[in-house]
Amino acid sequence: MRITDVKVFELEGPPRSGLALYEIQRGGLTPEQVTPYRQTFTEIETDAGITGLTIGGSTQVKALGQSLIGEDPICYERIWEQLYKRTRDPRALSVLDLGLWDLIGKAREEPIYRLLGGPVQECIRAYAAMLGFSTDPQAAAKRSRECVEK
């Protein structure tokens, strides 16, 4: 398996409901007037049809990603050393690092936590933030119950 392309692209859509509900966050705008949500992604493609997808990307990621073309993504340590020699931009390294781990996990049909050595503990406490969800007490209470049930 070899890396054939690294693409950086942006998706745009309307804000999700529940975001920017607080007047101070919107600056007096109605929810319809709030700027559309934009997010950049990076996708690492291979000749085997397996792709690694991660959030984030930039012109630096795009340029650095071109050095991955032709590489075997399973040779992670060698690739990481090459990337580190080419840049000290931690954001660009992080984006490509996450994309490579996603790709390796898909190729091996293993979750990333297992590739990194397995679980450290059997369970963790869940945390659910509700910042920006709703100022209505009943809606917040309903959402709190939903979070507890999950």
Where are these regions (language model features)?
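Short Gly/Pro-enriched turn/cap motifs at secondary-structure boundaries
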Residues: T30-T35, I55, R88, A92, ...
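Metal- or metallocofactor-binding catalytic centers and their adjacent structured scaffolds
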Residues: E43-E110
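Conserved structural scaffold segments of CAZyme catalytic domains across common CAZy folds
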Residues: L98-L100, E110-R114, Q121, A139, ...
